[in-house]
Amino acid sequence: SFSIDGKRFLVLDCGENNILRNVRSDGGRARFRFDDDKELAARFEEVINNTDIVLNPTHTALGELGVMTRRMAWLSENGRYYFTTSNAIQEIVDHKAKKTKIKRNRLPLDSKILHYAFHNGEEIEPVCDPQENEKDNDPYRIEYYEVE
């Protein structure tokens, strides 16, 4: 974690959001995965309660969006912001092949699954239209959000 201009950031790299789990018996609500370890749960609670902005960059676009959306919402509760972005190249692994094959698909830059932003448990929209660049086969998209 780190701070910029008084805002406290927490970075979860890619699959580190699996520190949360979704409880089916509670409507799929996200919770800290290791809540049976009281000391670890208390440490996580202290970290998350002292975070203003959660950044969760991912290597590939998120799967299981219902599960992940609940986690994004949970991480943004109580005034926090949550931001994630992904590469535009999606890897699809074929486990049924004799040798593992990885197929790479390029997602359109306007694909919803490349960027998510949440605040107070709700998805938020960028403050302006995304800026896109697709020259030299190096695609990227930039979105801007207002953070209070």
Per-segment meaning from a language model:
Residues 2, 143-148:
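Generic detection of short hydrophobic beta-strand segments and adjacent strand-loop junctions
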Residues 1-18:
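Beta-strand-turn-beta hairpins that frame and shape the catalytic cleft
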Residues 17-142:
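CN hydrolase (nitrilase-like) catalytic-core segments centered on the catalytic cysteine
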